[in-house]
Amino acid sequence: ANAGDNLLEVARGANVAIDAPCSGNGACGKCRVQLKGGELDSKKTLHISDEEFEKGWRLACMSKICADVEVLVPDIASAYKSRMKVADLSSKEEIAIFEKAKNQVEETGIQLRNSLEVVELQMAEPTLDDTMPDVERLTRALRKFMNLKRIRVPYAVLRKLPDVLRASKFSVKCVVRVTPDDMFVYDIFDAKEDVIMGGLAVDIGTTTVSAVIINMATGEILAKSSSGNGQIRYGADVINRIIETTKPGGIKKLQDAVIKETINPMIHEMCRSIHLPENQIYRMCVASNTTMNHLFAGINADYLRTEPYIPAFFKTNSLFASDVGIEINGDAHIIMAPNIGSYVGGDITAGTLVSMIWNRPEFSLFIDLGTNGELVFGNSDFMMSCACSAGPAFE
């Protein structure tokens, strides 16, 4: 830190959590710290009484560093940034909730299909009379199996291919995605190995992030986790976080807070609990409000807060794990539940689907009461939605 630096910004840079719901605008009075040594250039504020000021209390957002300084940071932020929790999924209730939702959707005629599968191949070993390169040997075997012209083998698979083929005596399993036009090879294993096709579903809330890992072959939930959203130190509501992104390097800071500090540690902890390598997660689904979608993808969200409130996207299929630094299989496709408005996001799309409002003749009201609140009203004939602030009072 240097003389003249803002204390709240210095604390954020050092990953010290200070409760600042207004993101440092001096409006909420929550970022209180106590001066224990050294000197701060602090503005007087109505949030700190004269008596408290004499005892060293200051607002971090209204304080500049003069020289070496020691401050006490109260453990206020822990109320927001909860510790990570990995849930026990052995209870019948957890299984029943998921099964009920899945069955209700399927009963309407919607087919839940998985475009990923594991294929087992036995190839002839190369000889002096058969000197075909490894990758062509693999694609030839896959082409016979699937009768597809275009087969894509990414660098990560190509790099491990020679060793896996020879260790397995050319008897392998491949994790592939098949479309009407082509096939993509995600991974390759010895045929003797048990292969789990992992899928990751994440709900990015303004305050809390929840996630599950599933077995994409069986639909079984393998692990579940929740954690406070690391972005909380940049503001409790979406508007203050958008404002934070307008500062130099702000978009990257907000993206790192939700991915590097929140989602990736959750992935590692869940994978550790079920003994699943992270690179065996081949698909990711994200449901979140429109602002969180933009911040997750590292896309400028500033135009969401000013008229006419236009997002960069409602839906996108162009995102992959390696694009945003999600630590799973780098070629994993990230599917984002589509937003339907500037402040009505993919979390509501997903919730509406599962709540079955769209398939019922009677009127229903679906409410997602989070920091950003959304409501959907309607039935099988129509649905309408709106959003409201449901977090900090000054929002």
Where do the language-model regions lie?
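Glycine-rich phosphate-binding loop of actin/hexokinase-like ATP-binding domains
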Residues: 202-206, 211-239, 303-316, 350, ...
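A glycine-rich phosphate-binding loop feature that marks nucleotide/adenosyl-phosphate handling sites
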Residues: 30-32, 280-290, 369-371
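N-terminal cofactor/phosphate-binding cores enriched in small/glycine residues
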Residues: 1-44, 211, 225, 266, ...
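Nucleotide/phosphate-binding catalytic cleft detector across ATP-hydrolyzing
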Residues: 52-55, 59-201, 206, 218, ...
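Short beta-alpha connecting loops at secondary-structure transitions
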Residues: 43-52, 335-339, 392-395
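N-terminal phosphate-binding loop and adjacent alpha-helix
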Residues: 230-273
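FAD-binding core of FAD-dependent oxidoreductases
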Residues: 25-29, 61, 374-376
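Iron-sulfur (Fe-S) cluster-binding segments and ferredoxin-like electron-carrier domains
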Residues: 10-14, 19, 29-80
